[in-house]
Structures are given as structure tokens and as C-alpha cells.
């Protein structure tokens, strides 16, 4: 879901959302 966000933690990469080029992880 967050492929375009660049370097992010694996958990954020798979479960997070991209907002303005940054990975926003669910609470």
C-alpha cells in the first residue's frame, strides 16, 4: 500500500497509508 513512500519500516510498508509522500501508520 505504501510502495511510493521510500524507506519505511516493514510494518508501515504493508499496513500504512501514503499521505503527501510519507507513510502514515494506523494507530
From Swiss-Prot:
GO terms for cellular component: extracellular region. Transmembrane segments: none annotated. It is found in: Secreted. Expressed by the venom gland. Disulfide bonds join 5-18, 12-25. GO terms for molecular function: potassium channel regulator activity; toxin activity. Keywords: Disulfide bond, Ion channel impairing toxin, Potassium channel impairing toxin, Secreted, Toxin. Its main location: secreted. Blocker of voltage-gated potassium channels. Inhibits voltage-gated potassium channels Kv1.2/KCNA2 (Kd=0.96 nM) and Kv1.3/KCNA3 (Kd=1.3 nM). Does not inhibit Kv1.1/KCNA1, Kv1.5/KCNA5, Kv11.1/KCNH2/ERG1, KCa1.1/KCNMA1, KCa3.1/KCNN4, NaV1.5/SCN5A, NaV1.4/SCN4A or HV1/HVCN1. Strongly inhibits the expression of the activation markers interleukin-2 receptor and CD40 ligand/CD40LG in anti-CD3-activated CD4(+) TEM lymphocytes. Belongs to the short scorpion toxin superfamily. Potassium channel inhibitor family. This is Potassium channel toxin alpha-KTx 32.1. It comes from Centruroides margaritatus.
Amino acid at each position: 500500500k505504501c510502495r511510493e513512500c521510500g524507506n519505511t519500516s516493514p510494518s508501515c510498508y504493508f499496513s500504512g497509508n501514503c499521505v503527501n509522500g510519507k507513510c502514515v501508520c494506523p494507530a
